[in-house]
């Protein structure tokens, strides 16, 4: 089990580094150059008093339509950090999802081979456990083989079907707690993404307040850009958080189903066939 935790920690660090490098590369080569080019474009047409004369133009000379470009929305550092955290969280969710898929494939295997009319006696528990003990260590540490061994060992030691069923229930509950603990870093990112967006909100409001003096003289471009930082950071953070939370809840649902199906597997194929005499 320690090797599993070490592998998860290594994957988490590697995923964070790769996410940061990938997002930074995209920002440096695509998003910020495109945003700078859009903001540098002169107004396509002068402000017109007619309603259908063309796009509204800010005092900085950039059409308002261009300010709604996705490249302009994503260009600031808060959005970059939010996207790095979101991609990292999705990598962690994907890793945990692959572990769930590996465990689910084991439900198709027949670890306890019982012929028609055969039962499992306490003295036979050790013999039925030997095929599981001969499995590779990684497979032995997965939920289904581990819970089967717990059931067989408890049945052989106590000669009680009820104690064996209780041991399986406790093992499944421990697995749920372990899976929940593994998602702590994903929950951290789900909290950190809106926090980063709030930092952008505060920065944008501060920038807008600094330009308030210019607005008194009729130049609202600075206030507009400051409020744009606020809205863009908030929008990016909220959308990223929604995506992360959606996949997080999908993963939790898959984990809960896995544990429930494993418990039903053991009850149907082992517990029901246990006999004390």
Model segments located where?
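Channel- or pocket-lining gating/hinge segments that regulate access to a cavity or pore
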Residues: 165, 169, 218-277
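Large intracellular
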Residues: 1-9, 13, 25-172, 276-277
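Membrane-interfacial helix-loop-helix connectors in multipass membrane proteins
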Residues: 60-63, 209-228
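Lipid-exposed faces of alpha-helical membrane segments in multi-pass integral membrane proteins
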Residues: 14, 18, 81-94, 196-199, ...
């Amino acid at each position: 089990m320690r090797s599993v935790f070490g592998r998860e920690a290594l994957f988490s660090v590697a995923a964070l580094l790769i996410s940061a490098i990938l997002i930074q590369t995209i920002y440096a080569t695509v998003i910020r150059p495109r945003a700078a080019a859009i903001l540098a474009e002169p107004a396509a047409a002068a402000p017109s008093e007619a309603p259908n004369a063309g796009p509204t133009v800010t005092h900085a000379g950039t059409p308002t339509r261009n300010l709604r470009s996705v490249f302009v929305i994503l260009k600031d550092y808060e959005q970059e950090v939010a996207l790095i955290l979101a991609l990292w969280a999705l990598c962690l969710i994907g890793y945990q999802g692959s572990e769930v898929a590996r465990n689910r494939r084991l439900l198709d295997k027949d670890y306890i081979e019982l012929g028609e009319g055969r039962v499992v006696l306490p003295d036979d528990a050790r013999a039925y456990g030997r095929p599981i003990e001969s499995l590779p260590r990684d497979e032995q540490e997965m939920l289904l083989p581990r819970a089967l061994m717990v059931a067989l060992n408890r049945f052989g030691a106590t000669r009680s079907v009820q104690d064996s069923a209780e041991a399986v229930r406790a093992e499944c509950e421990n697995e749920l707690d372990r899976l929940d603990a593994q998602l702590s870093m994903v929950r951290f990112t789900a909290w950190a993404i809106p926090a980063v967006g709030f930092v952008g909100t505060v920065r944008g409001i501060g920038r807008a307040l600094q330009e308030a003096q210019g607005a008194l003289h009729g130049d609202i471009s600075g206030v507009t850009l400051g409020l744009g930082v606020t809205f863009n950071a908030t929008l990016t953070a909220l959308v990223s958080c929604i995506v992360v939370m959606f996949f997080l809840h999908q993963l939790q649902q898959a984990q809960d189903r896995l544990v429930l199906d494993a418990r039903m597997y053991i009850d149907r194929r082992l517990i029901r066939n246990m006999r004390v005499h």
